Amino acid sequence: MFDTVCTLPLSADLFAQAIHPSEPIISVGLSTGHVQTFRLPTEEEEEHSDDEQASVSSSRNGKGHIDTMWRTRRHKGSCRTLTFGIDGEMLYSAGTDGLVKAAKAETGVVENKILIPTAKDGSVDAPTVVHALSPQTLLLATDSSKLHLYDLRVPYSKVAAPPQQTHRPHDDYVSSLTPLPASDTSTSGFSKQWVTTGGTTLAVTDLRRGVLMRSEDQEEELVSSTYIGGLSASGTSRGEKVVVGGSSGVLTLWERGAWDDQDERIYVERGAGGGESLETLTVVPEELGKGKMIAAGLGSGKVKFVRMGLNKVVSELTHDETEGVIGLGFDVEGHMVSGGGQIVKVWHEAADSIGGEKRGFGGDSDDSDDDSDDSDHEPKQGDDSRRKRKKQKGKDRGKGPEIMAFADLD
């Protein structure tokens, strides 16, 4: 069981969300080009804080603080995608200004930049996905369906240095990228292969050998993906699958190593003309005691929970009534973070599911932090050419906490 303990209002539409790998920190990228980083309270701070002052959250009786660590207008266009480095020290952002910027996660100070190669006509080839594969390798996908590999050890130059490799795994832009865990024989422990979705196909690319394969046409746009291991192994199955979210509300399961075609389908959202798009996927931490489970953020604003093995939806909650969910994940403390529209919500296990008092937390206003990077003024709402499945802006978000329970699992 989860309840929402905090709602963070944003100054513009959310285009990207990233969660720190080892600290309770989240970063957001906005349509205006702003990047903002928040620190969430730890479990210990939540339990012992006596601070009852007003906060930016909608939590009625929350304790503790959500602090704005820094805020800046990082890109002159929109900020399309964000990712933390492997160790969490760096935050990489990419925008429609044709730049990737590497900044210190703690302070927001930019330490390196990458110029994205332009399109054939000389225009900006805007980014769609950025992912730090290892401390040395950054993956960057663009609107033109290119997938660039950069060596992070190369310093910034005003003369655009070419990427170390460029691949084209799909005919359409890369909509999601999921690294595959390193093999047991790996000496570095870092991923060397990854799965991408783009258009109606899935592809697997190797760091050294390039694109290894591309699936058959799935006759449906593939939107999101995630990896889950530790499933029941039987026959040729190793218990490792990549789960892919489609534009019509269907999850498809792909056995690792058998990439030609999907082997299972799960209907998450049904509708007369097809279900809502599954915009983002994440694995629910097993520490929460719910078994193997996937959380899916939908274009309708709902978050649905799918129990693997049962292969069915066991519960759902609502992030927003009008805006779709484009960011979803869990921080190191077990908080679920959902983002979409102009709000980010932070959730935790409800009191009756963990046998303790209800915990909550609030935060400080983000309006007092000065921008620290490329600009110190608020621009008008940035426009973006990305083919995004966006809905009209929501109007009233002043709602109380929502509660979600897992049917037959408590």
Swiss-Prot record:
Gene name of the record: jip5
Family per similarity comment: Belongs to the WD repeat WDR55 family.
- Lineage, top ranks: Eukaryota, Fungi, Dikarya, Ascomycota, Pezizomycotina
Gene3D superfamilies from the xrefs?
YVTN repeat-like/Quinoprotein amine dehydrogenase
SUPFAM superfamilies xref list: WD40 repeat-like
Gene Ontology cellular-component terms listed: nucleolus
Q: Does the keyword NADP apply?
A: no
Q: What is this protein called?
A: WD repeat-containing protein jip5
Keyword presence, Repeat: yes
Q: Which organism is it from?
A: Emericella nidulans (strain FGSC A4 / ATCC 38163 / CBS 112.46 / NRRL 194 / M139) (Aspergillus nidulans)
Q: Where is the signal peptide?
A: none
Compartments where located = Nucleus, Nucleolus
Q: Segment Disordered: which positions?
A: 41-65, 354-410
Which regions are flagged for Acidic residues bias? 43-53, 364-376
- The principal location of this protein is nucleus
Q: Where are the WD repeats?
A: 9-48, 74-113, 119-160, 223-264, 273-316, 320-357
Q: In what ranges is there compositional bias, type Basic and acidic residues? A: 377-386
